[in-house]
Amino acid sequence: MDYQVISGSGSGSGSGNGASYWKYLIIIGIYYLTPSIQVIIYNGHDCHYNVKCSHQLGTIKAFNNVISNIFYILFGILYIIIVYKKEVHSNGITPNSGTIGEKSLYYSLGVALILEGLSSAAYHICPSRLNFQFDTTFMIMGILLSILTLYDKRHTDRIMAAFKFYIIVFFVITLNILALTSPGRLWFWAAMFLLCSYLMIFGSIYLYYGKEYDLDIISYNALITKLKTLSDNKMDQPRFILLVLLNIFTLGSCIYAAVSPPDFTGWILIVSLVNMIIYFIHYLILKYINGETLYHSIKFAMFIDTLLLIAALYFYIDAATNIFLPLVESDTMGKSCVLFGYFDNHDVWHILSASALFIFMNILLFLDEDINDIITETIVVF
């Protein structure tokens, strides 16, 4: 396989384009959560609680659903500490070795997990269809940051500027709001299909050709002109297969959504998650193809993480409420407490999913420890 080598131009210490990621994220979190809490508190007439396991504290009717989000916050803080410790330790390692990577992106993952805990806690003050967007925004953002972090490991010189990334996130949030105000509207999902197609074409070309293609080229005529000038290298088969898989899934999801409009928030969350999983598996396969390996601790962590994810999804699917049903129908789904006589199924989902996310973020952090002693310029890019 004819791959390029990693460019040594990245810093890996928080400078450059990635340095502002966590700073922007904190600012976004403050300005997003503040009005969100106001909306949730003053929109308390349609709240869906598990009537068989709701423990009130003050004016909060289901405090157990709120406090169980503390695990996201604690794991986020712990992860930031781990990243800091690793960064300090890395300063003593031979320079210009291993994958470079922007440490700022890892700090952003920790911040995103903390913000997910805060936003989910706020949402559970009054769980409803309208408020559901607040429960998933930072989950989606964390998934997108994970994809970017994995990509950045071997493409540090091509890291997207923070403001461009958050502009994309802004459009996702805007679409989420439009979907809430126009549920099931054909025009919305038709527009989504066109947008998906547009992003798939330009995104695929950018990911395939790399630095030869400028991300700022967004018009069709400019695209055709630029493609004619690109080098005609031998096909990068692994990358081509990855893009085919991603495009098949994403296009299929867009067609399904246009034909049978689902809930947009859940839809975009699933599409983002599956894209991340496909890319992660692709990364692992190419590590092995190129003679790299994984430490046994990483393999064990991946095994445990898979079990936690499966268990978390079980408790999430076995729901005790449904915010998309009328309140009376949702109340009939109530289930008894399952943990310590205090926490219900959804609380267990919070605990298990927070644990799974924490382990996965650590896997991302330590994934390439096996090549720490290899000169950066000799590490293949994929």
Indicate residue ranges for each PLM-predicted region.
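Long, hydrophobic alpha-helical transmembrane bundles and adjoining juxtamembrane helices/loops
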Residues: M1-F382
